Amino acid sequence: MNETRKNIRIVIIGDDLISSGGDPKGLGWVGRIVAKTQSEFPRVDFYALPTPEVNSAQLADQWLDEASKRFSADTDNRLVIALNANDINAGISMSRSRLNLANILDTATSKGVQPFIVSPIPSRNPQLNYEIEHLSSGFEDVAARRSLPFVDAFRPLVDHKGFNDELRNATFGMPGQQGHGLIAWLVLNQNWYGWLAVKFLFGRLV
């Protein structure tokens, strides 16, 4: 164990999905991640900052001011960008969506903040999913060009029966307990611990 390692602060930005929307247990995928990322040293603190219906342009404009209030010069600062499909309804072009994400990532890395990107999830509207897949691929390319971790939460779930059943039956089109669990599983198993550069065993750092 490296006794000189700084404590970790993780800020998560996104829309309602990061506030456990739709999950009857009230955990959401973020709460499940938190439960699997507990340690005494280094200490890991999470700060979820959901903004309803936020799009990539708004995230790019507001994230730094909000995140900076949670970061410290004495901590290892991390940023999770939970992307969504709101750019489509907002009429934001693919090139602008890519630029918005690029600006977030470049600003973060220039300030010593390490980003981790999660793609948009599928919609219960099959027609919209064609556009979401295209948008997600664009976001993935932006991350890949910077060699930054990107979790594809779209392709593994777009044809998942349990996930889609929850979306169809949900009042506001949000995933339920199973859906949030699936998103958390994808995040945890796509380089989450590698990104943190720590190993966890039964909630404790080893």
How would you name each of these model-derived features?
Residues 82-86, 104-137:
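Active-site segments of SGNH/GDSL-like serine hydrolases
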Residues 51, 85, 120, 153-155:
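Active-site loop/turn elements of alpha/beta-hydrolase fold enzymes
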Residues 38-41, 73-78, 106-110, 143-147, ...:
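Short, surface-exposed, polar/charged, turn-prone segments marking secondary-structure boundaries
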Residues 2-99:
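Conserved SGNH/GDSL esterase-like catalytic core that processes O-acyl groups on lipids
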Residues 15-16, 87, 106, 152, ...:
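Acidic side chains
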Residues 32-40, 66, 103, 107, ...:
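Alpha-helical structural signal in soluble globular domains
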Residues 44-46, 115-116, 148:
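Hydrophobic anchor at the start of a short beta-strand
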Residues 122-206:
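Catalytic His-Asp segment of secreted/periplasmic serine-dependent ester chemistry enzymes
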